[in-house]
Amino acid sequence: MSNLAEPLLTPEQQTMRSLRVLSRLLDYPTAELQQAVGELVEIVAAENRWPASLRQRLMSWCQQIADSELLSLQAEYVALFEQGRATSMLLFEHVHGESRERGQAMVDLMDEYRKAGFELDARELPDYLPLFLEYLSTRSDVEMARWIGNIRHILALLAARLEERDSDYALVTHALLALIGAEADINAHRPVVKAEKPDNTPEALDAVWEEEAVRFSAASDEDCALQSAEGRRLAERKQGVQHDAVRILSPGAQPPAMGR
């Protein structure tokens, strides 16, 4: 991997790299992530849009990732993001659930990706947050801020839920909101989240499995396209499909097809 923290970057280039770091931190943990921690720390340290306290916490977490057992990191990730929907990495699940409105929202987002010259892996959905951040890392500052502004309510809710579970992954949502000066948005969600019933209990997870079993019996392509990515991941895990790493690219590099 090339040196990602080279000097003389413009603020916009620095934020592009910061977004790629956040994308990678939110994706399924791999040995590649652990090996790249030194470079991630350098990039985080150089991001002046984040307060010093947030940079320090992110850097400490990165080092903790490097020092942890990979299987433990992966188990934590699955328990946090793939058991229940409250902390789903699928943006539109927080807005539309599994309705057809979500399907249209995904089609619209896919169109945005294609206009920018990106093609997604057929296994991935466009509202997967690490993938979305990879896309934002290729956009201008103005466009990046607009997109983050559009999802700030989702990020703030997700931040509050991750805080409630004492997860360091909350740092990523804090960092995204900090890029547009919106960290205070989280305050309104904290009391609401404290009153929520957990959706990762055995009973709640059984209900999800039953719902997904019905979805996997859908006969039409349209119905299959509306399956939650959580359901797809459950099926992939049963079939032994491996997660691919989200890539971190240097500014100016030709963007690849997006996907995991």
Segments (PLM) and residue ranges:
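Charged, alpha-helix-forming regions
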Residues: 1-128, 133-260
